[in-house]
């Protein structure tokens, strides 16, 4: 456990982690502070951050299981202690860590008698089981158990369909919520008009990411939501003849880049996220898996660096070069200086 003393301050706005601990492989806790804030700001930030932590962060989970000769979800299999439904519920609880996008296949193939745990899941290299001791099933006889699994990255909670598949495939309630809980509290200090606030933010995660990582991703998601308003005063708003109605021109990547040509400040580059670009989904996913999130991140790499990214092709590099040349008249260097 790590603890630091919290002291009120009138210095520039800053944040720090004042407590961090791992209660188990599937329960991490972190406590953070942000200060000094003006009266009312702490509650504004705290509410928005809590919503982003609980609803905007993506997670990876098992969404479907398939096994032959299973008539329905509530049936039992000779030689297995648990029912099919209980096995599906155990698979639902498996915590995975991954940066994958799209759907991946995994499997379990074991022979009893033995206890089947998360360690027996055969998954792609990009997927990691957080707690390999998580129980799945108990085989009481020398039988073979083979289960095909489908793994997907998403966010929030998705209810399974009630209809069973004809091929022995059963959907699982997808709980893609790495943050178990998040709370915020406010400490006020000072007198009269000099009153200021300290925001305390508590985060519990399931082990697939740390509270600090969750805070970083939630902050990035919030920034991404507000980007269209950053230069709203520079956009031309087209008012219709009816004064009670108006149409705002859609936010597009080329429009933003046109503004950046006039103002190539580093902070502006940090405000352009690659998910707002015109890059194909495949290229975008490869970049994000390599922690390239903003235009500034992208411009910090050479063509040689991009080619080292897993699953990246020369066509992807050309697409990026074309986009940068078209909107910025900038070329990425072939090699690092």
Curated annotation (Swiss-Prot):
Its main location: plastid. Disulfide bonds: none annotated. The keyword S-adenosyl-L-methionine does not apply. Residues 265-337 are annotated as: Alpha C-terminal domain (alpha-CTD). Residues 1-233 are annotated as: Alpha N-terminal domain (alpha-NTD). It holds the Pfam family RNA_pol_A_bac. It is an enzyme of class 2 (transferase). InterPro entries: DNA-dir_RNA_pol_insert, DNA-dir_RNA_pol_RpoA/D/Rpb3, DNA-dir_RpoA, RBP11-like, RNAP_asu_C, RNApol_insert_sf. One of its GO terms (biological process) is DNA-templated transcription. Its EC number is 2.7.7.6. GO terms for molecular function: DNA binding; DNA-directed RNA polymerase activity; protein dimerization activity. It is found in: Plastid, Chloroplast. It catalyses: RNA(n) + a ribonucleoside 5'-triphosphate = RNA(n+1) + diphosphate. The keyword tRNA processing does not apply. The N-terminal domain is essential for RNAP assembly and basal transcription, whereas the C-terminal domain is involved in interaction with transcriptional regulators and with upstream promoter elements. DNA-dependent RNA polymerase catalyzes the transcription of DNA into RNA using the four ribonucleoside triphosphates as substrates. In plastids the minimal PEP RNA polymerase catalytic core is composed of four subunits: alpha, beta, beta', and beta''. When a (nuclear-encoded) sigma factor is associated with the core the holoenzyme is formed, which can initiate transcription. Belongs to the RNA polymerase alpha chain family. This is DNA-directed RNA polymerase subunit alpha.
